[in-house]
């Protein structure tokens, strides 16, 4: 006999962990949380400075794009967290809410209740900001579960040079990009608490695992959602060699992320009918937008060598790592306490006071002169200190798709993001790179710089384009593949219910109709907070 729960949540990422916490707060609600990955017991997950060591490990789905015809036919690596906490356990820990105009734009598309004014309380509900007293309390909180902090336990002098150099060219210094004004150059705010990574699992899930009405199962690979007609009634998952079916009497909530939520919908019979037929899957409900509208942020590195050994690269040597580890475990200070990011800048690339459309990530790590490295392998990096500025395209025009490779749930989906398909995307990245050159020429950064902007001739746009295509990476912020809206390509309505199906919602980054102006983890926590409220208010 199948076990019966009120709510079944598929995926213990940022959204799933919030939902498990909020829905199980009422002891009358029985909640099951299913996660395909294992427990988050890899020590490297919890040490911010060990960020790169969790990629291409058992805690990473390790997806790849199809060959990108506009990026030298490269297949581009797509890390995705496969553990409790999902990608919040493997990401670079940046806490960025985006721009108020992003959410007002969602509301203008017909998504009532999704304006920035509507959503700010949900951002605040989760947050426990370590520097709350220095922030505007109208935008921040110190009473939530999610630890957020500025880089106070380790900081290089390079980031102050970056902020001052940005200020010198017209991108003003800004204490708080998550406050009233996003524009400007700032220290990064990170999901770190007491020197340890703060993930969805550590903040929301683990503190409530002792609730009798909450069951969390790891290594539970969901194969399909079960329907009775057009009503979602259960889930089938694999645990080892055993196939298990469980039933939900209230709702099933899909929080598997922008690649796997559409994949699971299609495997379960919801998607474009022709796509389902191709793989021999019976169509439960045709929804043409499933897997469409894929958007992601893109960036590439521009590096500099520094005059001094005040960065991070020299810590790569084994002896330095031992010393840093001692400082971390004994004093909770030093390089292991920090994310790979120290600074951010947000601005209108045309610098005409328009909407934020571009971002710079600043890292106190040099990626070397020739960029002939694996960006996800720390030991590929040079031992010479420096810094990297990464021009980041916030609002790509190109759109991609997620589709099935087969009807086998174990096979990865086909991910075709169509990077740089629209020429405007490349033009923006070129323009952003030229702006970085200007920043590097400012004395505030030149004070620390031995050699900047390697390895190409800055006067040649062709060489810059070649460099972009050679080094371009995703910031792994995929969104939009189960978009919210009221048009024919919308998969969910503004309450995140799947159109045409009862008792099924999608709650993760896939519901974003348009990508936000910044890193996407903070918005996913917010989406889950709002979804939990809507679910609990639903009369069944």
Regions found by a protein language model. Give the residues of each.
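N-terminal redox-cofactor-binding region of secreted/periplasmic oxidoreductases
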Residues: 1-540
